[in-house]
């Protein structure tokens, strides 16, 4: 942000932002991005495309990685630019996901304009800013390993243990009757508790402005752990997890199935699992 008034508007929720990082040809190799910004007078002219832009169709502004030094090494020719979404040169197109939701968008820049004062961190210094933000993003995404939910924002009404008892049955002690499956659920719960303590430490470091190097590992483990949670739910539910819509399935069953489908992207978005290792 370039002014204190802009920061104040964010805190008051008067301005909604989206993030313009990934491009159709630049995902894991983000620094190969090709969206360019050319200086023209006291502004930049932006052309290119971003993809997987969360809530771009609802955002007022986008903080965007753009190439301003085409002759520089790829990491050194990137700038961090703030761009108004409400202008003729910016269009968005929602992407419908397999879960049925459309939180992501394609974002197109066709001679979009941004004032030079909205360049953050200095010309060709955007990669440093972006890396810092990615540390926070990965910490945030990793939290789905604790909360569940296919997109990290919604929880199913019942947890893994409750789903296991409901669909796999219980013994006289009200424990999951299938001992092998019960062991899987118990191990998942123990790992959740251990991961929670780790996330507390990472969170404390983040609060003081020092994102931990553990953010990458937390993102890796949290997303893989969340995917496993839903795999175990479906293992317990059996054919009850095969519904998409219509009669014969409860709302919770349909929600779990859709969330399970959504979790397949957890280990891709925000940096693939392979990139974190």
Predicted regions and their residues:
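Single conserved hydrophobic/aromatic residue that forms the stacking wall/gate
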Residues: 1-7, 11
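A short, Trp-centered hydrophobic/proline-enriched beta-strand micro-motif
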Residues: 13-21
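Glycine-rich phosphate/pyrophosphate-binding beta-alpha loops
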Residues: 26, 51-56, 98-99, 265-270
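A structural signal for short hydrophobic beta-strand segments in well-ordered beta-sheet cores
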Residues: 35-38
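A short core secondary-structure module
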Residues: 43, 47-93
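Glycine-rich beta->alpha junctions and the first turn(s) of the following alpha-helix
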Residues: 90-197, 266
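Glycine-rich phosphate/cofactor-binding loops in nucleotide/flavin-utilizing enzymes
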Residues: 127-146, 237-277
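C-terminal helix-coil-helix/basic helical segment that borders enzyme active sites and/or dimer interfaces
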Residues: 172, 193-248
């Amino acid at each position: 942000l370039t002014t204190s008034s802009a920061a104040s508007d964010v805190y008051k929720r008067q301005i909604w932002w989206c993030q313009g990082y990934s491009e159709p040809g630049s995902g894991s190799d983000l620094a190969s991005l090709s969206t360019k910004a050319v200086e023209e007078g006291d502004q930049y002219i932006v052309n290119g495309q971003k993809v997987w832009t969360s809530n771009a169709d609802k955002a007022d502004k986008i903080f965007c990685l753009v190439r301003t030094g085409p002759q520089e090494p790829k990491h050194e020719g990137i700038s961090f630019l703030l761009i108004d979404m409400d202008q003729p040169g910016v269009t968005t197109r929602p992407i419908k996901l397999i879960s049925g939701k459309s939180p992501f968008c394609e974002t197109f820049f066709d001679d979009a304009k941004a004032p030079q004062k909205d360049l953050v961190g200095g010309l060709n210094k955007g990669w440093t800013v972006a890396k810092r933000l990615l540390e926070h993003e990965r910490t945030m995404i990793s939290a789905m390993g604790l909360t569940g939910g296919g997109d990290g924002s919604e929880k199913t009404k019942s947890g893994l243990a409750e789903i296991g008892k409901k669909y796999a049955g219980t013994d006289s002690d009200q424990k999951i009757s299938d001992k092998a499956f019960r062991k899987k659920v118990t191990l998942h719960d123990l790992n959740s508790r251990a991961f929670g303590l780790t996330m507390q430490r990472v969170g404390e470091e983040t609060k003081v402005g020092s994102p931990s190097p553990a953010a990458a590992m937390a993102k890796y483990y949290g997303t893989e752990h969340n995917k496993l949670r839903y795999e175990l739910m479906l293992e317990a539910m059996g054919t009850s997890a095969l519904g998409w819509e219509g009669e014969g399935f409860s709302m919770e069953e349909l929600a779990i199935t859709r969330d399970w489908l959504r979790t397949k992207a957890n280990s891709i978005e925000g940096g693939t699992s392979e990139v974190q290792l």
